[in-house]
Every structure is written in structure tokens, then in C-alpha cells.
């Protein structure tokens, strides 16, 4: 008993020293979590020996001590991975590596530089929710560390890693609870993101690097301007038949630009539907995805889609274009979706081989 008391005193003194020093050195924070793990181990041993109090402190149950020890081990190992990377010399506060921040969405990641995103439901300023987004999210994978930026769009908070868009907060979840009309607007960085059927535009928003790269590879886009934080509007000039009157309908349709491989993240843009040469805002139009490539690969891929059946409405059999001008007879599989949001989720969650070309669009049914 006396030995346990002495060890606990030394351990807790060291923990208090870390609080007082307020260090910005990652090595000190690794040592802090090492002693937090040791404290849990001492409590666990004391409880095993039948002690319910030690040094006038209540000894937690075995389950509580074990759970906290596992969390301390996880954080210690995560920080050691970051320490062995190029980010070890950054300034790190004890708050940056706290358990509370670690468990905040996206969970299981070290994060820094948080800021508030406000979501207003049903246009009611009194019916709002606040979420935390992060400018630096550290994703640890085995011995490597990648830093990504938290981004925001109408659907939620997300980051893009290895070409995959991952949402760690989805606004529709709270809309189900607090919104009558299931409509909201997002306030972030001094900008407002409205429902995709009425996209707010501003020339003051800087577009992310990934969109600049995409537009550089797609010269067909003749005019660009910022739409909202993390997105950019691309308006392509489409010749309207002279006989068709201009109704002035402000309806917009959100559309995903074509991506050539899984490494290209889906990019949301907005096309003004007054250009009716291609897109119509009627109820018979459904979002689609064409997958083009080797027939056998597509057949295997279509079989794998069964476990993602909630992310699409229907999938076609393998088909080909025919005609004397068709030079490349690649196989095609087409998927349809109930909404563009469902299509976005499919493209962000389903792994598509790099040998398959992915293109998006709309089809009247």
C-alpha cells in the first residue's frame, strides 16, 4: 500500500508539473500522456488489491481505469507518430493534444486551429447550431502523417484525403431534429452558403487549391466565380436555340464536374439552369454517374456495389456505344440516384479503381 501511495504521488506531481509549465514542446506532451497512463495503471493495481481509497482519493473501478489507460496509450502512440514526422517542430499546446479535442469530430485525429461554423435552420436566427471546423487535421496512418484542411459546404464539414471526401459532420442529422422544413443556411468565414437550389455567390471567397487545379485541367470552363467557402461556381456558356424563350427562371442545379480517376475529389459547382440546352429543373431529371472501362472490371465492381445499395437508386447492366464512328468500345455501367447529395455520398465513400473513368451528369427518365 505504501509503495502504491509513493508511486501515485510521484506520478501526479509530474502531471501537475506539465500543467504548470504550459509547454509547447511535443516531447513534453508525450511524457504527460505517459504519466496519465501510469496513473491509470496504479489505480487499476490498487483496485485489484481491494483498495477503494488511496492517498484520500477514490480509486476508480477496474473498467474505468482500463478504459482511461487505453485512451492514454492511444494518444501517446499518436503523438509519437507525429513526433517522428516533419510536424514535430510545430508549436503544440496541451489543449491541442487533449482527450477532449482528440474525441471531437473528426474523432481519432489530432486537430489544431478550430473555428466556429453556424448553421441556421428554417431562416430562424433563434434556431441555430454551432459546429467546430479545423484548419489543420492530422491523419496518422502507420508511420506516416498527412495534414488536411477541414472544409465546409451546404451538406456539412468534411476533409479530402487521397481523393476521398469524408464528412465528419452532416447538417441533415440535426435538421431532422430541429428543422421543420429541412432547410438551412451555413454561415462560415463571413460567407453564407444557401441551399443548392439558390446558391449564394460572392467574388470575395478564395477557392481551394483542388478546384484551381481542376479548372486548369478543364479549359472548357469559360467563367468562374466563388460561390461559398470551399466551392466555386463554374458557368459554361451553352448556346440556347433561338426559338426557345428566356423565362428568367432562377432555378439552379448543383452538378459534379467530371473526374478522371479516384484521385480527383468530387467538386461541387453550380450551373444556371436558364441555359436549358443541357439541364432542366424538372422532376423527371435524375443525377447519374457513368463508369467507363474494362468490361470484366466493371462487372466485378457492379457486384461490389451491392454492399453500398443505400448509396444509389439503380445500376445498369454493362453496355456499349455502337456506331461506325465509335473507335473505343469500352464498357459502361450507369448508376442513378435519388438526389445529388446521395450521388455525392456514393462518390466519396465508394472506392473506384483508377482504371475506371468516372463522369457525372443528369438524365431525364
From Swiss-Prot:
HAMAP family: PPV_E2. Binds DNA as homodimer. Interacts with protein E1; this interaction greatly increases E1 DNA-binding activity. Interacts with protein L1; this interaction enhances E2-dependent replication and transcription activation. Interacts with protein L2; this interaction inhibits E2 transcriptional activity but not DNA replication function E2. Interacts with protein E7; this interaction inhibits E7 oncogenic activity. Interacts with host TAF1; this interaction modulates E2-dependent transcriptional regulation. Interacts with host BRD4; this interaction mediates E2 transcriptional activation function. The lineage of its organism: Viruses, Monodnaviria, Shotokuvirae, Cossaviricota, Papovaviricetes. This is Regulatory protein E2. InterPro entries: E2/EBNA1_C_sf, Nucleotide-bd_a/b_plait_sf, Papillomavirus_E2_C, PPV_E2_N, Reg_prot_E2, Regulatory_protein_E2_N, Regulatory_protein_E2_N_1, Regulatory_protein_E2_N_2. Plays a role in the initiation of viral DNA replication. A dimer of E2 interacts with a dimer of E1 in order to improve specificity of E1 DNA binding activity. Once the complex recognizes and binds DNA at specific sites, the E2 dimer is removed from DNA. E2 also regulates viral transcription through binding to the E2RE response element (5'-ACCNNNNNNGGT-3') present in multiple copies in the regulatory regions of the viral genome. Activates or represses transcription depending on E2RE's position with regards to proximal promoter elements including the TATA-box. Its main location: host cell. GO terms for biological process: DNA replication; DNA-templated transcription; regulation of DNA replication; viral DNA genome replication. It comes from Human papillomavirus type 16.
Amino acid at each position: 500500500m505504501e509503495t502504491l501511495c509513493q508511486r501515485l504521488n510521484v506520478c501526479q506531481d509530474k502531471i501537475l508539473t506539465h500543467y504548470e509549465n504550459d509547454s509547447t514542446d511535443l516531447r513534453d506532451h508525450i511524457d504527460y500522456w505517459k504519466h496519465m497512463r501510469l496513473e491509470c495503471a496504479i489505480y487499476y493495481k490498487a483496485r485489484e488489491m481491494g483498495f477503494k481509497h488511496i492517498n484520500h482519493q477514490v480509486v476508480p473501478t477496474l473498467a474505468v481505469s482500463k478504459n482511461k489507460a487505453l485512451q492514454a496509450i492511444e494518444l501517446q502512440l499518436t503523438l509519437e507518430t507525429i513526433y517522428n514526422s516533419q510536424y514535430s517542430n510545430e508549436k503544440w499546446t496541451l489543449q491541442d493534444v487533449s482527450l477532449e479535442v482528440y474525441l471531437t469530430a473528426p474523432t481519432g485525429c489530432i486537430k489544431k486551429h478550430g473555428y466556429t461554423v453556424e448553421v441556421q435552420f428554417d431562416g430562424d436566427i433563434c434556431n441555430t447550431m454551432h459546429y467546430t471546423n479545423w484548419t489543420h487535421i492530422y491523419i496518422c496512418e502507420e508511420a506516416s502523417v498527412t495534414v488536411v484542411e477541414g472544409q465546409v459546404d451546404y451538406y456539412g464539414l468534411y476533409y479530402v484525403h487521397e481523393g476521398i471526401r469524408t464528412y465528419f459532420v452532416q447538417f441533415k442529422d440535426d435538421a431532422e431534429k430541429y428543422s421543420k422544413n429541412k432547410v438551412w443556411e451555413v454561415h462560415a468565414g463571413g460567407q453564407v452558403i444557401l441551399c443548392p437550389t439558390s446558391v449564394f455567390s460572392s467574388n470575395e471567397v478564395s477557392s481551394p487549391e483542388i478546384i484551381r487545379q481542376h479548372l486548369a485541367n478543364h479549359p472548357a470552363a469559360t467563367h468562374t466565380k466563388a460561390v461559398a467557402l470551399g466551392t466555386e461556381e463554374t458557368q459554361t456558356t451553352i448556346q440556347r436555340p433561338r426559338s426557345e424563350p428566356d423565362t428568367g427562371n432562377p432555378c439552379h442545379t448543383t452538378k459534379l464536374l467530371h473526374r478522371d480517376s479516384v484521385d480527383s475529389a468530387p467538386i461541387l459547382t453550380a450551373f444556371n439552369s436558364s441555359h436549358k440546352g443541357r439541364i432542366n429543373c424538372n422532376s423527371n431529371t435524375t443525377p447519374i454517374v457513368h463508369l467507363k472501362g474494362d468490361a470484366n472490371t466493371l462487372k466485378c465492381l457492379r457486384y461490389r456495389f451491392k454492399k453500398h445499395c443505400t448509396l444509389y437508386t439503380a445500376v445498369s447492366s454493362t453496355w456499349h456505344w455502337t456506331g461506325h464512328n465509335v473507335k473505343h468500345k469500352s464498357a459502361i455501367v450507369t448508376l442513378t440516384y435519388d438526389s445529388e447529395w446521395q450521388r455525392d455520398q456514393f462518390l466519396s465513400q465508394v472506392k473506384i479503381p483508377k482504371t475506371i473513368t468516372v463522369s457525372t451528369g443528369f438524365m431525364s427518365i
